[in-house]
């Protein structure tokens, strides 16, 4: 459980005396810590740093085997001895010193606490995190602790070891952070920056991204802010960021990369109390550089470089984890780079690092927030450019990123509102497409965002790390319980997510239900309609069909057992159609597709590819194919999406727009992380060639994949053209599961003659549906009807202007209409929706005696 830390920034420095609120603790907690003790003696008379644990629960806790550390990379530096019991409501003091021996009857951890700040971690015997706190610079005999004991509020205190933490112990004086004379941002020319802080404080600062301490440069006068892009590369010169083999190399840029000046500053008072860290990223002279600096969001991530590149704790490097493997018994020279253990392959809370994030739009600062960052991904962690997960947490400051990361383009399916608040998000490196177009996944998901499946919002940005150009990233919604909550209005505690056939979010109960479904579909006879009905009660079939159709069309070969996700609400809520307890599906990481590497060809039969796999999706799809209803509905859904979502003209237009938007970012990013390999600078011609691969795939995919569909479904008919015409000023129409785009005139799609199509017309106010004109040969008068296809055919919805009061829809208002409305009100008859519209003479969207009286007056006149 991540706890609230009082005003703690990403650097672990405190700016206020009392913290933000968070969830109350529910187990043993780290209650108080002191890093400069000169007043409280241990049993041997010495003055040690100390940590106090507290048990806020109503029962004793056995701490045997629990671990305590001040280095998250080394959990369990101190292990509590067997028999250590912390009574209910009790406190336990642990002294800290790297060299001293524990005084008789007291506990001693083999590490000291730094007066400049620490992160402390308590773990259970399995290594699972129990609690963590972080604090900044602490003065003499000042502690950092919970007020009151065990609460979720933190403050700097007059230390109270082994005694209750009380409000009167809270130090009332907080040190304000330094103020910069100009806001961080993009400026045409350099300038002198003035720093100011409260009287009686001293300002210390750094310009290399490192944590400022009292050992840093002391501020004595204005700081010259200038264009530093020509300065020597530092972080971007690192080559220990990935392993090498015959397929991959790590080459640092040979020329300086674009840079910004990074200023971090603290104010320290006479008692040694420190402010939070003030951070500023300044980019000078970018007005004539690449347009993507103006067209895209720019995100600056600032963290002490050790958090990324330290041998032991750095999350971006091969590091000690790699060397231990290379020098250990498990080393195998044939291991591929993406399978090699390394620091950057590690995951979980122990490998999260603090950072300060600033976001700029059009050169101006729009958000500044302290966050946590981790490396994201599977195999792509081994790439030179790595993806980040970004977390907002109370212990860094704000518990959410309250900012519209996606420019109003991501909306909730539940209420239609713009999603502009996030617990976390990804900065994705384009995955397997990182060295190619960098927009495959975005393209694929955007093409089906209107369907009944969950897609991820994405928006391109440019990232700088400690002031150095880190290239194009895609701001991406993170697959999590928050994603489901934001889109579907499901409480996070009720969300269950299965990812790659494992429980990703939620309770064990949800995983048990998934496992039971998996086992059942392996043997179930779904040709039995009763069994198919049972399946439909557990799985949203339209979501499943939409999801499978999309992945089959992409020819995503890194999918099936991998890169699959599904979710459900564990609680049924009548007022939320998505909280019905059914499994629905999530698209993510779709880029291993659309002719990537020349391997996922448009001619491939992706149905056969999936059915060869031994995985849940294969078993579920294979079982569902036994059922006639599913085969019919899947055939129509697949052809709907092939005709509309993947229409070549539509896809080509989208590719052209993305290609223009991404080309400069892609070239700059490739030459930042893969300069000179293979064969020199990544050229415009190479980018054009990669883009053409995607374009050609979608232009030629239809024929081969629809033929494969016919084989998979054992269809005997042929493909024929359905042309649909409609006057959209009179009404809207639906073909099967889609609303066709008629903005350009007639809509044309192809369907197999084996399965009838469903046509539905919905007249607008002032009109009523008359009939479907079927090839000028036939008229169908039902607004919703099934049409058997025998050959190419044109259909048109025909409407007439509605006549208010014409309840029986015969074109006249007469006594017959009065009688029909009266029978309806007496519950002796029914009305269709179209008839109800004509009967609502008062326009109040309900039928009652007032409508009957108005119709009677009309007839009398």
Regions found by a protein language model. Give the residues of each.
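Short, compositionally stereotyped local motifs that mark structural "simplifiers"
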Residues: 6-7, 21, 29, 33, ...
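Cellulosome-associated attachment modules in secreted, modular CAZymes
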Residues: 11-12, 16-17, 21, 796-861
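Activation on beta-sandwich/Ig-like modules and their edge loops
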Residues: 20-154, 215
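Second-shell loop/turn segments in exported
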Residues: 40-41, 427-436, 534-535, 620-622, ...
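Short, solvent-exposed loop/turn and secondary-structure capping segments
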Residues: 42-44, 64, 79, 104-107, ...
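Conserved ATP-binding subdomain of kinase catalytic cores across diverse folds
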Residues: 301, 327-512
């Amino acid at each position: 459980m991540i706890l609230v830390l009082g005003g703690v920034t990403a650097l672990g420095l405190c700016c206020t005396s009392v913290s933000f609120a968070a969830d109350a603790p529910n187990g043993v907690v780290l209650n108080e810590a002191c890093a400069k003790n000169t007043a409280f003696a241990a049993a041997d008379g010495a003055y040690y740093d100390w940590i106090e644990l507290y048990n806020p629960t109503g029962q004793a806790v056995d701490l045997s085997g629990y671990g305590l550390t001040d280095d998250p990379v080394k959990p369990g530096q101190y292990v509590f001895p067997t028999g250590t019991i912390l009574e209910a409501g009790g406190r336990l003091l642990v002294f800290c010193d790297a060299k001293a021996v524990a005084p008789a009857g007291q506990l001693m951890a083999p590490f000291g606490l730094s007066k400049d700040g620490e992160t402390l971690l308590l773990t259970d015997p399995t290594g699972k995190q129990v609690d963590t706190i972080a604090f900044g610079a602490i003065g003499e005999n000042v502690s950092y602790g919970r007020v009151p004991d065990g609460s979720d509020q933190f403050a700097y205190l007059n230390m109270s070891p082994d005694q209750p933490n009380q409000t009167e112990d809270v130090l009332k004086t907080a040190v304000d952070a330094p103020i910069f004379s100009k806001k961080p941002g993009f400026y045409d020319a350099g300038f002198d920056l003035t720093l100011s802080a409260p009287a009686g404080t001293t300002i210390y600062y750094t310009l290399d991204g490192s944590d400022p301490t009292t050992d840093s440069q002391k501020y004595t006068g204005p700081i010259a802010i200038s264009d530093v892009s020509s300065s020597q590369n530092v972080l971007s010169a690192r080559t220990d960021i990935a392993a090498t083999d015959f397929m991959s190399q790590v080459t640092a840029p040979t020329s300086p990369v674009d840079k910004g000046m990074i200023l971090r500053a603290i104010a320290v008072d006479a008692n040694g109390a420190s402010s939070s860290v003030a951070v500023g990223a300044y980019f000078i002279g970018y007005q004539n550089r690449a347009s993507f600096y103006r067209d895209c969001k720019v995100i600056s991530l600032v963290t002490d470089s050790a958090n990324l590149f330290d041998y032991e704790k750095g999350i971006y490097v091969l590091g000690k984890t790699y060397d231990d493997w290379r020098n250990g018994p498990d080393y195998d020279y044939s291991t591929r780079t993406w399978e090699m253990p390394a620091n950057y392959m590690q995951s979980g809370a122990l490998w999260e690092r603090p950072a300060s994030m600033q976001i700029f739009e059009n050169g101006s600062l729009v958000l500044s927030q302290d966050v946590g960052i981790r490396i994201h991904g599977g195999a792509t962690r081994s790439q030179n450019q790595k993806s980040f997960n970004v977390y907002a947490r109370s212990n860094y400051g704000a518990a959410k990123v309250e900012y519209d990361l996606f420019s109003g383009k991501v909306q909730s399916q539940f209420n239609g509102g713009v999603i502009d608040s996030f617990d976390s998000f990804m900065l994705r490196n384009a995955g397997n497409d990182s060295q190619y177009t960098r927009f495959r996944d975005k393209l694929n998901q955007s093409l089906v965002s209107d369907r009944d499946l969950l897609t991820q919002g994405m928006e391109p940005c440019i990232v700088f790390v400690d002031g150095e150009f880190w290239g194009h990233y895609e701001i991406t919604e993170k697959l999590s319980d928050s994603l489901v909550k934001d889109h579907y209005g499901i409480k996070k505690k009720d969300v269950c997510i299965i990812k790659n056939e494992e429980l990703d979010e939620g309770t064990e109960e949800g995983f048990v239900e998934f496992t039971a479904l998996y086992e059942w579909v392996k043997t179930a006879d779904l040709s039995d309609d009763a069994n198919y009905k049972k399946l439909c009660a557990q799985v949203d079939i339209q979501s499943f069909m939409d999801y499978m159709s999309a992945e089959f069309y992409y020819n995503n070969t890194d999918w099936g057992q991998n890169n699959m996700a599904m979710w459900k609400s564990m609680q049924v809520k009548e007022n939320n159609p998505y909280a019905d307890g059914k499994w629905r599906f999530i698209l993510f990481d779709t880029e291993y597709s659309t002719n990537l590497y020349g391997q996922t060809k448009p001619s491939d039969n992706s149905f056969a590819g999936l059915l060869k796999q031994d995985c849940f999706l294969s078993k579920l799809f294979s079982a569902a194919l036994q059922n006639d209803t599913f085969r019919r509905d899947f055939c129509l859904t697949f052809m709907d999406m092939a005709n509309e979502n993947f229409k070549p003209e539509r896809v080509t237009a989208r590719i052209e727009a993305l290609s223009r938007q991404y080309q400069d970012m892609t070239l700059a990013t490739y030459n930042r992380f893969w300069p000179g390999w293979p064969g020199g600078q990544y050229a415009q011609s190479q980018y054009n060639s990669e883009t053409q691969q995607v374009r050609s795939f979608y232009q030629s995919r239809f024929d081969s994949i629809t033929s494969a569909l016919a084989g998979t479904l054992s269809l005997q008919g042929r493909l024929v053209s359905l042309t649909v015409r409609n006057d959209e000023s009179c009404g809207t129409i639906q073909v099967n599961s889609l609303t066709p785009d008629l903005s350009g005139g007639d809509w044309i799609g192809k369907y197999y003659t084996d399965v009838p199509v469903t046509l539905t017309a919905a007249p607008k106010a002032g009109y009523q549906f008359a009939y479907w004109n079927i090839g000028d040969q036939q008229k169908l008068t039902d607004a919703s009807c099934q049409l058997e296809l025998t050959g190419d055919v044109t259909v048109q919805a025909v409407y007439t202007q509605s006549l208010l009061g014409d309840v029986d829809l015969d074109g006249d208002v007469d006594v017959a209409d009065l009688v029909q409305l009266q029978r309806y009100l007496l519950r002796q008859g029914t009305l269709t929706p179209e008839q109800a519209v004509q009967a609502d003479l008062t326009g109040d969207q309900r039928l009652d005696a007032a409508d009957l009286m108005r119709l009677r007056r009309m007839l009398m006149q």
